[in-house]
Amino acid sequence: MPWANRCLTSLRQSIVPCDITIIDNGSTDGTQDYIHNNFPEVDLIRNKENLGFGQANNIGLQKALDNNYEFVYLLNQDAWILEDTFKHLIDASEAHPEYGVLSPIQMKADGLHFEEKFGSYIIPHHQVFSPSLTEDLYFQRIEDVYEVSFVMAAHWLITSKCLAIVGGFSPTFSHYGEDNNYLNRTNYWNYKIGIVPSARAIHDRGDSKWSIEKEMYVNDYVGSLVSFSNPLRRESLDTKIIQLLKRGIRNRQMVLIKYALRLKKERCLADANYERTLKEKAFLK
């Protein structure tokens, strides 16, 4: 709830009007009542349980398709926009319809520095690095949009045409990896992913730090599922499982062995969901 006021007030102040839908994943901290009382214009959908990031978003994405919205903007609860964020993104989208997903420059809460994860994507040697963006930011010769292979889903503008083909988030991923998988599928359906440097927005992660075990979960367990579910260059899950088992035994890290066994158990579901991603409008009606 700490971010709700900042997030929703920023949407009210946008120079491009928008309809707001909030998917509440069974919160019990008073967020639902706060939104109902202070932001009555919001369509608040109350889930009885936490469905996870992807499946909660699918509820909103389905609503957007059913109501023929031209664009959908995914916004984290710990994030907010500037007055002109939507305008810059929509202008770029209309000028470059080959892009299915666009993101603004994502800043820390101070508005002066790149959000830490976002900043790492646009530095040299990172796998999604865009050298032209980095150089142009330095020399102040900015293009409308820069293509990247990944940008985190705290701020995404998705076009209705892209959504109608790519569909929703895969239930293979309950926490982390949903955005990687979605963007791989976006590329599979011949849509590009881009960053619009004229558009700025805030993602306030605070001072949260990842534990070593969380790093392993994201990089090893989730990363294996992302590779196995990538329709562009699918990798063997058996190979990933064997690698995790060997590392776990060699380094005496039981958590890696646990992840390997979990991957083996969930293989059938992940395989079935992969087949669904090869069809249009996957995971939506």
Each model region followed by its residue ranges:
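Non-catalytic, C-terminal membrane-associated alpha-helical segments of glycosyltransferases
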Residues: 214-285
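Short beta-strand-to-loop acidic/aromatic patch adjacent to the donor-nucleotide binding site
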Residues: 69-80
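Conserved donor NDP-sugar-binding/catalytic core segment of glycosyltransferases
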Residues: 84-117
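A short, conserved alpha-helix in the catalytic core of glycosyltransferases
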Residues: 149-158, 162-167, 172-200
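Short, acidic, metal-binding catalytic loop of nucleotide-sugar glycosyltransferases
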Residues: 9-18
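A conserved acidic beta->alpha catalytic loop
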Residues: 24-33, 49, 79
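Glycine-rich, basic loop-to-helix element that forms the pyrophosphate-binding segment
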Residues: 47-67
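Short, flexible, basic/aromatic active-site loop/helix in glycosyltransferases
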Residues: 122-148
